[in-house]
């Protein structure tokens, strides 16, 4: 059932242009607004026991991020049958996976790079909006392409590979929990909210295994001998951000040829295109592994 849902959703995601009603960001924003209106999540400021208040707020954040997934899992277990669960899981996965805005920014970046408009390339890189990893640029075509390619690799992981892995491991509740946590972390980071550090710690934990599985897929689909030492280096490190793990390994897994490096100096789109191809091959790798696990009976 999981494999069928993945194949169905990935096919539809490629064929259909999603409206906001079919993307997690809309519902995550509504959920956060509901919690805010009810006063269920807020940073409790005060001179007395400030650390205790912060801890309570962090615990509340984790609880309310997990709550919808628990409710969804209970509904699947006690209410829905096998067929309805398949329909429900496919719908939830379709809502959680992908990012129409990311795809639009990518196309705009390619057009700007083809025109040689580096200022527009820099603007589109900023529009990718990964709050926790802002990278400086010297304005050259090579640097703009590298910066955009790194952000694109990370966001592609967050919106595709990570969602797939959480879905494979825990079904629709897992995909929903990860997507809601990712969206909330970005919102708190953009707003410079006091809880952004707590949300960041949660995402570090949620990404720790999936990002290494994804990076392993990239080295399998790319230059294995070059990327393997880098993967081993980061495999058990607990102090390296997931963003750095993925971008460092992907840069080793897919190295530009001399001709591509020469073109990259003039056209910022070369490296992002190469990394997107690597990400697509990685998705296929994850599907193949899922198929194998399904055949041996490890997945339902």
Language-model-derived ranges and their functions:
Residues 1-300:
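Hydrophobic N-terminal alpha-helices or hydrophobic patches in metabolic proteins across all domains
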């Amino acid at each position: 059932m999981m494999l069928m849902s993945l194949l169905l959703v990935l096919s539809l995601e490629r064929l259909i242009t999603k409206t906001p009603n079919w993307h997690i960001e809309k519902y995550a924003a509504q959920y956060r607004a509901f919690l805010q209106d009810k006063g269920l999540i807020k940073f409790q400021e005060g001179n007395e026991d400030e650390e205790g208040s912060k801890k309570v707020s962090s615990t509340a954040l984790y609880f309310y991020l997990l709550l919808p997934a628990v409710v969804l899992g209970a509904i699947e277990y006690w209410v829905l049958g096998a067929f309805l669960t398949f329909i429900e899981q496919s719908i939830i996965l379709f809502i959680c996976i992908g990012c129409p805005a990311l795809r639009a920014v990518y196309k705009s970046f390619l057009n700007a790079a083809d025109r040689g408009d580096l200022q527009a390339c820099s603007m589109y890189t900023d529009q990718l909006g990964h709050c926790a990893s802002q990278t400086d640029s010297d304005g050259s075509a090579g640097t703009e392409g590298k910066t955009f390619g790194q952000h694109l690799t990370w966001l592609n992981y967050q919106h595709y590979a990570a969602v797939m892995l959480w879905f494979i491991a825990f079904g629709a509740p897992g995909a929903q929990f990860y997507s809601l946590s990712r969206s909330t972390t970005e919102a708190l980071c953009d707003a410079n909210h006091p809880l952004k550090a707590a949300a960041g710690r949660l995402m570090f934990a949620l990404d720790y295994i999936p990002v290494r599985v994804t990076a392993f897929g990239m080295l399998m689909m790319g230059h294995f001998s070059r990327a393997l030492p880098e993967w081993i280096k980061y495999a058990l490190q607990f102090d390296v951000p997931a963003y750095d793990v993925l971008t460092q390994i992907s840069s080793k897994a897919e190295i530009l040829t001399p001709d591509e490096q020469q073109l990259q100096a003039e056209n910022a789109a070369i490296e992002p295109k190469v990394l997107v191809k690597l990400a697509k091959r990685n998705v296929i790798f994850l599907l193949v592994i899922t198929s194998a696990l399904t055949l041996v009976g490890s997945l339902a």
